[in-house]
Amino acid sequence: MQHTTSLRHRVSAARTAAVLAFGTLAVAGAAMAQNYSPELIEKGRYLATASDCIACHTATKTKPMAGGHSISSPVGDIVATNITPSKSHGIGNYSEQQFADALRKGVRADGAQLYPAMPYTAFSLFTNEDVHAMYAYFMEGVKPVDEAPKATTSLPFPMNVRASMIGWNLLFANDKPFEPDPAQTPEWNRGAYLALGAGHCVTCHTPRGAMMQELASKSMSGAQIGAWYAPDITNSKTHGIGSWSVDELTTYLTTGHLPGKSQAAGPMAEAITHSFSQLNETDLRAISTYILSVPSHKPEDPAQRNRFAHGQATDATAGFRGTSFAEGMKQSGTALGAQIFTANCASCHGASGQGTQDSYYPALFGKSITGEANPSNLIAAILNGVDRETPKGGHVFMPPFGDQTNAMVPLKNEEVAALSNFLLTSYGNSAVSVTADQVQVIREGGAKSSLVLLARVGMAVGAVVVLLLLVLLAKKRGRARRR
């Protein structure tokens, strides 16, 4: 009887344990596959759009967020990973905390460090509520793609040691969420939150130091990003965009085009197409309000023209009309540039560089691309062209003249330099000139950082110091033994 009772107790205990275990698994399963509200998922989608995730993490339009896009950096190319909710190749197994750590701290679920090409230094400003919304979107609003990018990140030593980012993060990363400034308006604070966090404007527009860290003392004052130059967007009327109004900046962020001042190309065109143009007007005006309040870090010079005030309509081609193309191409300098312009550019931009009346083909004078002291964007636009979608189904296109398979007329470095100098002399900042060597640097994706070399030298010096210390220690021990 005692044996039977004991057996019953054991069976009952086993059943209870099974029920508890099943309940625990059910709760865990529910945590992994929650049914988020449509409103929360939509909020997350909006924040992901504001963060421009799709621009870097999409190589093929039919597979959004599946990774594979190569990002050019001064230390090498970094390949964006699959961030779809795929459980085999994406982030489908990430918990919300792991997702938050990747987004705000640059730490993957496996503990490996991300490179700051992923702007976690800016995304650290996200609030917990917004991270929660983004997690909901990526888990339930993005279609999983069960394949890995064909290419992977392969940086030179020692940058390929991801653990090296731990020290960098301790020195330069921010780990505090955004704190509103009580002295500012709600609109300004909303704009600051979006511009500094999701929009990560500082990531591109702020120059970097020897360790590739953002120089806070020069925030938004302009920086080289690969082949392109992200210009000064402080409120300086001489160096930045202080001459713009909130309405004008909002228009530019919406369309990528501000007649008489600027036309988006390169990474900024991508940001406008995939991100800014998709935001609501209230947020765009808030961003504009904040950006136009960012102080300049350079002294104002009323006598100096800003980059939007150079050049005028000039028919600089009249002097060689009647000359054959073959003869014209034998010229050098700006004369060669004028021939190239007439043959390849004037049909769209006009013989006087005036563009079209509707500005679909923009004027070449009074624009940042020809007025900027740094000619990188002019060179990059010639080599790479412009190809972007605009709101309401529009399309901006300029053919490339580099070495792409779809280049209309592949131009040599000397020819690109000649064309650039003709454009600068005729329609832009004539104090700026371009060399064939500069063109080659832009053709290769921009100047490379000396950080890799510095790191290797530092490691070599460190190894020598350690070796010397070991030798000295060995000698000291040898003397002690002889005594």
Residue positions per predicted region:
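Active-site substrate-binding loop specific to GH73 endo-beta-N-acetylglucosaminidase modules
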Residues: 66-76, 207-256
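Short, solvent-exposed loop/turn and secondary-structure capping segments
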Residues: 58-59, 64-69, 111-114, 145-152, ...
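C-type cytochrome heme c attachment motif
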Residues: 46-58, 81-82, 97-105, 116-119, ...
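Sequence/structural segment immediately N-terminal to covalent heme-attachment motifs in c-type
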Residues: 36-59, 64-72, 165-169, 179-209, ...
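Post-cleavage N-terminal segment of exported redox proteins
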Residues: 2-40, 62, 78-81, 102, ...
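Sec/Tat-exported extracytoplasmic proteins
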Residues: 51-52, 57-60, 87, 103-111, ...
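Axial heme c-ligation environment in periplasmic c-type cytochrome domains
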Residues: 77-93, 104-129, 150-154, 230-241, ...
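Short, low-complexity patches enriched in S/T/P/G
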Residues: 446-457
